């Protein structure tokens, strides 16, 4: 089974233990992943698409008061509704990376926890009276 297919099944199905592990590890590694995304990955993605900072990509849904700088922070402070899709892109990439890291960790933990297949128990020894009856039968056949 390919790792992409396993990851998709993990992300879609999962179970309570996987979710609990994800929450705990996600909380612990959230800042590290945020730094990796914002400091390492998003600048490269930004260079490819011509924008270095995705957090300032937005669509204004109202009128901007005169004299307000055209930045996301300033427009939000002015109370103008905005659709901040750049921030969403950053958060979505952050989520995918974090989910993949958790998936790999849970996969490794599950690999360690897998039990070796249990061999079926040996059939019980034939009772002595049955063995004697078989011996008698075999001796009568001769």
UniProtKB/Swiss-Prot annotation:
The keyword Transcription regulation does not apply. The keyword Transcription does not apply. GO terms for molecular function: mechanosensitive monoatomic ion channel activity. The chain crosses the membrane at residues 10-30, 40-60, 86-106. It is found in: Cell inner membrane. It is a multi-pass membrane protein. InterPro entries: Mechanosensitive_channel_CS, MS_channel, MSC/AndL, MscL_channel. Signal peptide: none annotated. GO terms for cellular component: plasma membrane. Its main location: membrane. Keywords: Cell inner membrane, Cell membrane, Ion channel, Ion transport, Membrane, Transmembrane, Transmembrane helix, Transport. Belongs to the MscL family. Channel that opens in response to stretch forces in the membrane lipid bilayer. May participate in the regulation of osmotic pressure changes within the cell. Homopentamer. This is Large-conductance mechanosensitive channel. It comes from Acidovorax ebreus (strain TPSY). The lineage of its organism: Bacteria, Pseudomonadati, Pseudomonadota, Betaproteobacteria, Burkholderiales.
């Amino acid at each position: 089974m390919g790792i992409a297919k396993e990851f998709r099944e993990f992300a879609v199905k999962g179970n309570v233990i996987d979710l609990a592990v994800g929450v705990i590890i996600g909380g612990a590694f959230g800042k590290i992943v945020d730094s990796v995304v914002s400091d390492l990955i998003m600048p490269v993605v930004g260079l490819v698409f011509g924008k270095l900072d995705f957090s300032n990509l937005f669509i204004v849904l109202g009128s901007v008061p005169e004299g307000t700088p055209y930045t996301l922070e300033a427009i939000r402070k002015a109370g103008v509704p905005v659709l901040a899709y750049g921030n969403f892109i950053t958060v979505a990439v952050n989520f995918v990376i974090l989910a993949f890291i958790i998936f790999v960790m849970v996969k490794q933990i599950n690999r360690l926890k897998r039990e070796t297949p249990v061999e079926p128990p040996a059939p019980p020894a034939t009772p002595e009276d049955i063995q004697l009856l078989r011996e008698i039968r075999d001796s009568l056949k001769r």
